[in-house]
Curated annotation (Swiss-Prot):
The lineage of its organism: Eukaryota, Fungi, Dikarya, Ascomycota, Pezizomycotina. Its EC number is 2.3.1.165. Changing residue 216 to A: Abolishes 6-MSA production. Residues 1073-1218 are annotated as: C-terminal hotdog fold. Residues 1-40, 1701-1721 are annotated as: Disordered. GO terms for biological process: fatty acid biosynthetic process; secondary metabolite biosynthetic process. It comes from Aspergillus terreus (strain NIH 2624 / FGSC A1156). Residues 1783-1803 are annotated as: Required for catalytic activity. Keywords: Acyltransferase, Multifunctional enzyme, NADP, Oxidoreductase, Phosphopantetheine, Phosphoprotein, Transferase. GO terms for molecular function: 3-oxoacyl-[acyl-carrier-protein] synthase activity; 6-methylsalicylic acid synthase activity; fatty acid synthase activity; oxidoreductase activity; phosphopantetheine binding. Gene3D superfamilies: 3.30.70.3290, 3.40.47.10, ACP-like (1.10.1200.10), Malonyl-Coenzyme A Acyl Carrier Protein, domain 2 (3.40.366.10), NAD(P)-binding Rossmann-like Domain (3.40.50.720), Polyketide synthase dehydratase (3.10.129.110). Residues 940-1218 form the PKS/mFAS DH domain. This is 6-methylsalicylic acid synthase. Changing residue 667 to A: Abolishes 6-MSA production. Homotetramer.
Amino acid sequence: MEVHGDEVLSVDSGVSTPPSTGSGFRRPLETPGTEIGNLNLNPQNEVAVVGMACRLAGGNNSPEELWQSILNRKDASGEIPSMRWEPYYRRDIRNPKILDQTTKRGYFLDHVENFDAAFFGVSPKEAEQMDPQQRLSLEVTWEALEDAGIPPQSLSGSETAVFMGVNSDDYSKLLLEDIPNVEAWMGIGTAYCGVPNRISYHLNLMGPSTAVDAACASSLVAIHHGRQAILQGESEVAIVGGVNALCGPGLTRVLDKAGATSTEGRCLSFDEDAKGYGRGEGAAVVILKRLSTAIRDGDHIRAIIKGSAVAQDGKTNGIMAPNAKAQELVAWNALRTAGVDPLTVGYVEAHATSTPLGDPTEVSAVSAVYGKGRPEGNPCFIGSVKPNVGHLEAGAGAVGFIKAVMAVEKAIFPPQTNLKRLNSRIDWGQAGVKVVQETLEWPGNEDDVRRAGVCSYGYGGTVSHAIIEEFAQQLQRPTTNTTDEDPLPRILLLSAPQERRLALQARTQASWIAAEGRNRTLESIATTLSTRRGHHDYRAAIIAENHDDAVQKLSDIVNGKAAEWTTSSRVLDASCSKDVVWVFSGHGAQWTAMATDLLKDIVFYQTISRLDPIVEREMGFSALHSLASGDFESSIKVQVLTYLVQVGLAAILRSKGLEPQAVIGHSVGEIAASVAAGCLTAEEGALIVTRRANLYRRVMGAGAMVLVNIPFVDMEKELQGRTDLVAAIDSSPSSCVVSGATEAVLALVEDLKSRGVNAFRVKTDIPFHHPMLDQLSEPLREAMAGSLSPRKPRVRLYSTSAEDPRSMVARDIYYWTSNMVNPVRLTAAVQAAVDDGLRLFLEVSSHPIVSHSVRETMLDLGVEDFTVTNTMARNKPADKTILSSIAQLHCRGAVVNWKKQLPGPWALDVPLTTWDHKPYWRHIHTGPISASTLHDVDKHTLLGQRVPVAGETTMVFTTQMDDQTKPFPGSHPLHGSEIVPAAALVNTFLHATGATTLSNITLRVPVAISQPRDIQVVVSQNQIKICSRLTQKAGSGADEGSWLTHTTGQWEAGGSKNAPAQLDIAAIKARLANNKLADNFSIDYLDKVGVSAMGFPWAVTEHYGTLQEMIARVDVAPDVPATSPLPWDAASWAPILDAATSVGSTLFFDQPRLRMPAHIHGVQVYTTQPPLKVGYLYVEKAGDRDLAVHVSVCDELGTVLARFESMRFSEIEGTPGSNGSEESLVHQLAWPPAIYSEKPLTINNVVLVSRDKNVADLYCGSLKDRVSSITVLDAAADLLSLSQDSSSVLQAKDTAVVYVPGPLHSADSIPTAAHSFLMELLLLVKIIVNGSLPTKVFVLTDRVCESESATALAQSPIHGVSRIIAAEHPDQWGGLIDVETPGQFPLETMKYVQEADNIRISDGIPRIARLRPLPRDKLLPPSKQTSLLPRPESTYLITGGLGALGLEVAQFLVEKGARRLILVSRRALPPRREWADILADASSSLAPALETIQALEAQGATVHTLAVDISSPDAAPQLAVAIDSLSLPPVRGVVHAAGVLDSQLVLSATSDSVERVLAPKITGALVLGTVFPPKALDFFMLFSSCGQLLGFPGQASYASGNAFLDAFATSRRHQGDNAVAVQWTSWRSLGMAASTDFINAELASKGITDITRDEGFRAWMHISKYDIDQAAVLRSLAFEADEPLPTPILTDIAVRKAGSASSADAPSAAPKETNEMPESIPERRTWLDERIRDCVARVLQLGSSDEVDSKAALSDLGVDSVMTVSLRGQLQKTLGVKVPPTLTWSCPTVSHLVGWFLEKMGN
């Protein structure tokens, strides 16, 4: 149907009509003093329903489909989809039986998991974490807005309100109860508020956005709130509705228990057999506006909300029991608000939940309000939609509301579904209300207004009611007949957020236009698509003359065929202007029939008619006649008619909604351009062109013009000095037009042809723009005297006559004489427009004559994304070419006011957006949860639930394992991946079989723990094996995923056949007395070869051995007293067997390698008793194999309890220390010599910035004669004025800006100077970056690496920030150089050392930073290897002591023997008497600190806390006094762990933000240094960070402070202190750099990982063994053999994989096969585009890179901050180019990234 603002289509239903209720039955309210009259319509206080949409069970995906289902009495109930409850069947062994007894029928969507995530720019990962209710609401809201004719994008930034009813948290429970797999986005993804907030977020709405939970009344309450928001002026538009999704069984079980649900899962409203309701799911959304606004906007007003009310039913018989009186009162309140007599209400849509109590109660309330007082035979009709689509609970009210609106709108009472016998508990005879049992026409006279009531109630007591009525002012009119439509062509628009969707939209529209759409005019369809639909970034447009033409062209789009009058493209990039430049060309566009079509256009005809009298008066001919006849016999007439056609075309364009934002005129076209820009009236322009044309008669035949393929500048040089010929028009970078005397022009043409240069005569006999025309200047000035009143242009106007194209010179008569004589500088004008960001050009002429020149200029300027089009073309229909040009510009993003072109009615039923759904459902991996089905980790086996198998000889144990359920207590990493120890697998075999004899055990593939696995242990006659596969994801078939066999073996039933052997322990020890090994020999050996941790906590307490045999006394639980029970199942053999496999592997210690068991010939257990806590291991070399041993496990008397027979090891490829050993964890900076580049950096100019004149003078002297210029500035601020000078050296690429902080003469001013130096450098960088200057920044510091002076300490923070600047702004950063001889300018180093952020010159040699293992020559003697550990008799102080990391340090120190601690913090703890209350409050932020302190005290430690802000300069005496007051033994160790993390980018850093971060680091360290002078402490540990070494973006301040700590530690070492700065990586879940998804991704992008608490303190212990001032604690990731490193500092510690095997678990969007980058630029672009899209697809977990739009913003595709970091890593790995962290900020799309990589890789 087609709708004007005052029209709707009537419906001919062909149904019977009951008696009229009449208007004479109105009566007053039963409230004293209040009456309801028949109030007049007040558009200001009424709310209109302008749009509706729904998605409901039974395929009811629109209100119209719902209406048809209601009329057809369809019941959409059915079985719940099987996948919904599947996770709950696995969660508890009791669940299956209970769930089988729970109602499984209801009203379900076929695919509630489906969502068009890409449409909304949501990544698959985030979509999976979004409640289906949020997804449904997004899509249905979009549909409702389109139904309302409101382009969703048009609401952006508006105060549109969103109120959505929601109260199901099924999906939230599903996700958030899966504790190990909870992720950050699940919070908002499953919150109630996420439903409305998602809508507001994606549509950029700024009005109220609220989730409404009033149980089953929620959505009608939401409609009430929306109405109020509009009437109170909060919002102009309200999006209201409700949603429900049934994702879990919990609430269904509750409702079953409460008796609310029907066992059949069906609703039987008002029926005798109603015993409860069937739950339903779906969404319903309604769009509301103030009535006056809707009328103003020409909206289709479907109904009016006259009034609404919400209340509560108070204290009833039970909170869920209904209250008829409350239902009556809320209805009366709604009627009072509406000013409506209840007797005028013809229909009530009831809540009608089909419950035995609910239906009778509700009918009695409806009867009391609407039935009382009605005459017999005139009842109020009642019905309910629930039997059709179920009870949607939070969405129920909105669904009932939609049904009521449809009934009012269509004037029909629809029949009630599932009604066989009326409920006998209701007195229908006296009720005055009647259930609709057959379809009825709405009764009444012509003047009666149709009204309906809507009821909705919540089981918590909320009652709500709404009154709606038809919009009676809308006139009824029949469907428009298309046969009367004018045959003019129309533009039909399509759009989509991704290119591939255009075909989907085209197919939908083509199908509809070919069928139902034939009943709509093509104009109404065009109006809808242009003015009532949103316009996405990918656009298509067709010019169609009729329906068949439209269908054909749309089909061509579907089939990918190019067709005339069809255009499609993406809008210009967001960084480009969408403004349109109108280009008015000059002479040469004319053709005979150029005005034939134009004169049919009323706008064109009227424009020419208005100017024709001027032409006739001035020229003596009729312009109308000449245009109609095609009479262009002379150049003079062409001049005039060209102007008129251009002015007429401009008028047509404006009438069709296109306006210029900039204008260029070419030659005579400048006159029309000035008119279009508003400088002249059309009449003034006509006077100029006619009077000048008359003067041209004097020079007719005097000359000629020729277009030549030679650049204008070159032609000027060639013709220099000649007067007969001039270069007259600069057409394009490769061509120009020459004007002059005819003979000279002809001669030039012949000459050019002889030289092979193309030359083309221009059809004219007047030498335009030649000096000979200057003779006409004075006559023209006289002729135009007093005729012009030029004004300033309303839009940008570029001149082609003036030398400066941006000249604002008045368009007076002097301008027009210059225009006649001067050269035409078109190229310069186009270039100026391009420089101003313009990319869309429209040639306004009868034929394109400069479009090619404009394109050529654009390409010459390197612009690739642009459009040049034209209004007309020779022999093409003008109406279509004009529309086509507008369509092309629209498709590129130009603004078109479509309502000017299409002001008529719009068609309501044009299809809505076509969705491209994909399933997104979180598959839960953690089940089973029940202890009866999951393996017991304390038994150290993988035996889970035993599954019966047909036959008697096979049994299968199944379980699932992840890092939370690994069957061993410790850690067992191998090459960075944790695996199950072999001992746990053998133990599994023993317990699964019950055997004591195993044989032929083959350990094929380790069982990895990195991802959740399904495990099977299969036991058959005498065989056993362990198999696994990765736990299957959602959507995978049951049989998908390969099973991998890890370990196989054989077993024998019965006990041991041999008696246990007896070993002579004493004799073995005596034999090996001279070969005593350290107790920790095995642990240290394994640590060095790469086994950094043990799966079990055994310890060797006595060890002897040679290469042939070993004996070791082992305690499997050294921390457990002998009298205490073990912390695991006592029957487990795994702990002692793990010691056996581990110690056994060390027998070959002369060939240190990483080895693991590969095969065990036999395992024998000789005892039925549990293994002992303490026993002996005897290892013998097996004679039959080089790498095989026998291991006997015996008690302390030598009785053998178990034995490994011939255990063979295999060597594992890898680097010692590569998988988590302390050697791979702890590093130190080394400074190897730098490698000089073969291509030095060009530096010809140096700008020195230094406040120290002496330093500046020294460096200037050193630079003399080595560079072209030296500029000295006192401060960075001076750079600003210099940068604004276009001629300054700062505009040159060969300029280096060098900052030199001055010396410091007093240590007291270190904090102030450090802050000053830092801010100076940051200001300097900001000026260069913000000014887009091509220069590079360098910094020279004075021996900071030696850290022996106050100057060095003050300058040290610069060493930290420098790497951050390099990371954030790599193109502007040159480098930091720490010089050893101040005054000697390191120019050669700056030029030749280019791949280092920081450089140190030592011994005259430039050196670069590399991390390397701690040097062996710094290893302390064994007696001193506890240099960083506490002594019981001393006191230890920790700053930041109440922070998470500080508390962990406290626990570690107590574990290592400390008994007195002082925890320093800025905050004071409350008195001890309050601790109990605080600890009882689980939400208290203090509770963790108090709990830790109490735990430490329980271990025998004394803990004091001091509230001292050590960042304060006067903190030293305060701290000293506070420590003395405690009367403790001397403080012998200090850990400075205080700090503030305030992530800010370099460009955002402020003085205050920097100081806030620096103070705890710098001032804090200096305060501690004052309180504890050198040599006063056993150790002084400063907690720094590795961020300043690797260049983490956003850490400018933090890196600076930590760099100071590094230097301070070195300085204290020089003074004899045992000081060390530890540059930590992120601690997992601890401290300021606690691991988050973002931090982990950032670490990975730098090639490192985080560490655990245990690893951190193992590193501490390791550092304690060395005499060093700094240590970096981090672990390298494993890189492919040829993979580039993300930062060179890792070069010497990076772990390289031994091959390049791809992971079996890689995402489906795998990278394309790598090949060489092509040579040509276009091929390179394609090559890069493919690879970058692959990377984005992998990060987003998309199935194909085809789903990645190169032009779309990465953020719109769903790339969040965490994914951005991952993307950088993918790009670096794929393309081998170092990617700065800020790249995606400056390059927000794939296309931008292609350009960046093209430049980088091209260099």
